[in-house]
Structures are given as C-alpha cells and as structure tokens.
Amino acid sequence: LLDSAGGMAIAAEKPDPRAVIQHAREHSVGVMGIRAVAAGSLTSVIDRPDAANSAEQIDFERAAPFRLIAAEMGISPAQLAHQYALSMPGVETLVLGVKNREELAECLAAEAAPDLDMSLMQRIDAAVRD
C-alpha cells in the first residue's frame, strides 16, 4: 500500500520505488519523494469528488490500520505519512501537494519531528503490506 501507484498505475509491472531509492543511495544520489499521502489514501478522509470505487478509495480502505497507528501516536495520518517518507533512508525531500493551511501545518510538523524509528516503520509496513 505504501508503494501503491494508485490511479497513476499505467504499466503492467508493479512499481518498486524502494528498489529505486536503494539504487540511488548506492550511487550517492538523493531522492525527492512524491505522493507521500498516496493521493489521499493515507489521510483522515478522501476529499476527491470521484473517489468512489477508485484505486485511491481502495487504498484508503486498506489503510485503516495505518490510521489506527497514527491515532495511537496522537497525530494525523497525513503527518505520519510524511514522517514515514522523510524517515526512509535515501529520501532527501518531498514534493508537497497541499490544498490548505491545515495540510501545510501537518507537513511542517512532520518535517520538524524526529525520524521514525525502524521498529515503528516495520510495524507500519506490516500493517499495510500488500
């Protein structure tokens, strides 16, 4: 789920962004992450008008355990998604797709927070594994 292309999937083969990040690290190339909230799938609510039965809606439903982890931590799912992405070794920065000040504040809080520890990242991975 965390690596889902959602509705942007156009190739028959499944993307493997983690392999790309690892390859970039091996060659000392920084990575600019995109889609940290997976087109809204890793947020509190899908706010797209055409979300019903979309790839994003399917991913949103599969991300319920992710939202529970965020709630346990006392932060929004969007903040956790951004913290997760920024905590990935090799990811240097993120492209933000914010629509309002609240979303921007979540991103700034994620950037100011310490990296997530590996055990929490593994727990998140296990909770939303394909």
Model-predicted segments: where are they?
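Beta/alpha (TIM)-barrel catalytic core signal, keyed to glycine-rich beta->alpha loops juxtaposed to Asp/Glu
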Residues: L1-R129
